[in-house]
Structures are given as structure tokens and as C-alpha cells.
């Protein structure tokens, strides 16, 4: 699977699992993405896909690396569809 395809799948999953934040942008908690069964089956490396999407300015989140448990409440914000 190529990175662009995985990033597109990530955008679809953020639409499915996310909700609008105060700024009107779609947002989902990292823990929600990480624990979702469909996401677990889709993404071999969710954190790597998130980093690729962040580099492309498709999503944003604080910091560079997200870890299960520690960062479950971190918002992943969709910047573009």
C-alpha cells in the first residue's frame, strides 16, 4: 500500500469517527483512532500514516510522536479533505 493511499484512508476514517471542534474543523482523539477495529485492520502503522499526513499538512496535532495510552486524549485535527 502506498503512503498517499493510506493518508486518503486516514482522512476517510477521521470523517467517520470525528466531530466538528470549536473552529468547525473535524477532530478525533488519537485513542479513538488507535482503538477502532476498522483502523487497526486498515493501517499497518497508524503513527507513521499520521506523521505522513502531518508532513503533507492534511492533519495537525501537537508534538511529533503519538504513543498509545500517553496521548489517547490528543486531538488529531483535519486541515484539508
Curated annotation (Swiss-Prot):
GO biological process, one term: regulation of actin filament-based process
Cited PANTHER family: COSTARS FAMILY PROTEIN ABRACL (PTHR46334:SF1)
Protein name: Costars family protein ABRACL
Family classification: Belongs to the costars family.
Record-listed N-acetylmethionine modification sites: 1
InterPro entries: Costars (IPR044302), Costars_dom (IPR027817), Costars_sf (IPR038095)
Alphabetic keyword roster: Acetylation
Amino acid at each position: 500500500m502506498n503512503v498517499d493511499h493510506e493518508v486518503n484512508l486516514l482522512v476517510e476514517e477521521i470523517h467517520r469517527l470525528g466531530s466538528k471542534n470549536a473552529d468547525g474543523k473535524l477532530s478525533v482523539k488519537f485513542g479513538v483512532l488507535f482503538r477502532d477495529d476498522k483502523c487497526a485492520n486498515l493501517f499497518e502503522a497508524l503513527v507513521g500514516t499520521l506523521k505522513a499526513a502531518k508532513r503533507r499538512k492534511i492533519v495537525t496535532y501537537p508534538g511529533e510522536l503519538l504513543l498509545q495510552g500517553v496521548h489517547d486524549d490528543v486531538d488529531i485535527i483535519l486541515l484539508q479533505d
